[in-house]
Swiss-Prot record:
The keyword Ion transport applies. This is ATP synthase epsilon chain 2. Belongs to the ATPase epsilon chain family. Pfam families: ATP-synt_DE_N. It is a peripheral membrane protein.
Length: 146
């Protein structure tokens, strides 16, 4: 008997491996392993690296950003998570994840900068329109944004 591992995200089925001898993951209680014939299990897993291997084979890896692991029937293990990145080499997987995190940080900084720019433009536009309104008192508005 062997295990089948399926890892899915909302956008794609990232991984499906059959004939596995063991799977290792981590939840709030710590690390745990699954072997063929394991009792049914449902747990929330932490962000980290899921490890799996075939009999007599090397470990393979899949970095996940938290999720839900479900083992059913002693054979099928499914992981539903927000993001997953499979990899054969742990060092290369870590380097790739670091690059992805840096790119996400840069994109978030650009988005924050754009949000500030749009907010400032909206305030300027509002001030121009209010300034044109007859009898408008802008003193409270101006003080609120200084």
């Amino acid at each position: 008997m062997s295990l089948t591992l399926r890892v899915t995200t909302p956008l794609a089925a990232v991984l499906e491996e059959e004939g596995l001898a063991s799977i290792r993951a981590e939840d709030a209680s710590g690390g745990f392993g699954l072997l063929p014939g394991h009792v049914d299990l449902l747990t929330v897993i932490e962000a980290g690296v899921l490890r799996f291997r075939r009999p007599e084979g090397p470990w393979h890896f899949c970095a996940i950003r938290g999720g839900v692991l479900r083992a059913t029937g002693g054979r099928l293990v499914t992981v539903a998570c927000r993001e997953a990145v499979p990899g054969e080499d742990l060092a290369r997987l870590e380097a790739g994840l670091k690059r992805q995190a840096e790119a996400a940080d840069q994109a978030a900084r650009r988005a924050r900068g754009e949000q500030v720019r749009l907010h400032a433009n909206a305030i300027r536009s509002l001030m121009r329109h209010l300034d044109r309104a007859p009898g408008a008192d802008l003193s409270g508005i101006v003080e609120a944004f200084e």
